[in-house]
Amino acid sequence: MKNLFVLFLIFCASFCFAQKEDLRKAIKEESINGALDFSKMLEEKYSSAPFIRFGNTLYNKKDFAILLWGAKVKNLGIESLDETIKLWEEIHNKKLTTPESKALKVGFKTKFE
């Protein structure tokens, strides 16, 4: 019985890991020119506006797209801010700047309904 329980735990852990890897892969695929690329939508919707107000802060379109990406990734199931930052940097092959990092953190912590 004890061995069966251990095998069950190992199976559950490997299944959860596989699901998380599938999620990361899907996020990577959709983040550039896909459903998680908010830059085109923002450019179309706010073409004449240089900045977008969110709360008491003005964001340029690039940073606001990162904010929306952070919120969506959290909503999809990535629970760690550090993992989200690392994932964004892997996708874009560069480190986040300070304003980009702040926008990502705000998006990650914001609950959209």
Tell where the protein language model's regions lie, with residue ranges:
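Sec-dependent N-terminal signal peptides
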Residues: L4-A13
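Glycine-rich short-loop/terminal segments
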Residues: C16-A71, N75-E83
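Active-site or metal-binding loop neighborhoods of secreted/extracellular toxin and effector enzymes
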Residues: S80-E113
